[in-house]
């Protein structure tokens, strides 16, 4: 019920992902709770927007996964006001089109606009042992075990926008 009636973008997004699959060979879905919309959303993530170590065989045991997120400044501002990201000034930098993205644009008949108002965020899913937030044993001593976090960094200025636990 939820996917077909509440998540209105699910079907068009899934269609886009399935259309893209033969072109790229791999595609991904990201399901998360959107604070601004107040509901769970499911988004298509192209393979070229996901960075993993070369020898990764699956995402569950991967030590780090980075999702490259292109976001409009207005959407970023909404997320900042909702408390998802730190309220800092992010000035977008006009990015170069990669060779892969250029070929995808050519195949799909798209032309990039001359003005790019988007900012680029790097959402890193990593295991960290942060001082003051360590895992502790029964005696209260740090164990040295790294805990899962999601760290979001602005690629445009290199500043950290958020660090939050990624509970498993």
Regions found by a protein language model. Name each.
Residues 1-168:
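Extended alpha-helical, oligomerization-prone segments that build pores/tubes and scaffolds
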